[in-house]
């Protein structure tokens, strides 16, 4: 095995092991014991190899972290998988809850319930099982309630580099036309999931 092939194999292994979290070129350079520039060159070689060959994965970059992802041309097959109960779409309650968590994280269930005006336990369970939110700590004070926040998968699923890419929230009363647009947004969002 050539020296370059050995380094490529190490980088590919690191990409696999880090999964959805991905890994930065700086971290790869430190672990493989090469320069960051060489890592970038090797990532380009690996990306080209994956594009040329009949492989089910590709190299993706998000927020200066690299990871292995599935190829877009296999999306129909993955949609079939997503239609299973574990990977199914989200209810309106779950979408509302997800939006609240995304914008107000870290946040407790009681705080979510207060914003929504109804209980959110089932919606939270659904979002946790779909890996869109996770426990991110405990609130201080009596009871030490669980705090929820979004996951890296949430960012990836919605094509965001970071939470700063979320649209700005504007406190306004929606007229009927705007409400219809909001409903269409939630319908599209649910269809995408």
From Swiss-Prot:
It is found in: Cytoplasm. Keywords: Cell cycle, Cell division, Chromosome partition, Cytoplasm. One of its GO terms (cellular component) is cytoplasm. GO terms for biological process: cell division; chromosome separation; DNA replication. Homodimer. Homodimerization may be required to stabilize the binding of ScpA to the Smc head domains. Component of a cohesin-like complex composed of ScpA, ScpB and the Smc homodimer, in which ScpA and ScpB bind to the head domain of Smc. The presence of the three proteins is required for the association of the complex with DNA. Participates in chromosomal partition during cell division. May act via the formation of a condensin-like complex containing Smc and ScpA that pull DNA away from mid-cell into both cell halves. Belongs to the ScpB family. This is Segregation and condensation protein B. It comes from Shouchella clausii (strain KSM-K16) (Alkalihalobacillus clausii). The lineage of its organism: Bacteria, Bacillati, Bacillota, Bacilli, Bacillales.
